[in-house]
Amino acid sequence: CPCGRRRCCVRGLNVYCCF
């Protein structure tokens, strides 16, 4: 994932950057 230093979180079918 293009999250930079943040890790990638997966929730169901959504993939996003962890806050």
UniProtKB/Swiss-Prot annotation:
Keyword Plastid: no
Main location: secreted
Gene Ontology biological-process annotations: defense response to bacterium
Assigned keywords, A-Z: Antibiotic, Antimicrobial, Defensin, Disulfide bond, Secreted
Domain of life: Eukaryota
Annotated S-S bridges: 1-18, 3-9, 8-17
Gene Ontology CC annotations of this record: extracellular region
Protein's cellular compartments: Secreted
Record family assignment: Belongs to the alpha-defensin family.
Chain's role: May have microbicidal activities. May inhibit corticotropin (ACTH) stimulated steroidogenesis and the microbial actions of the corticostatins.
The protein, known as: Corticostatin-related peptide LCRP
Source organism (scientific name): Petromyzon marinus (Sea lamprey)
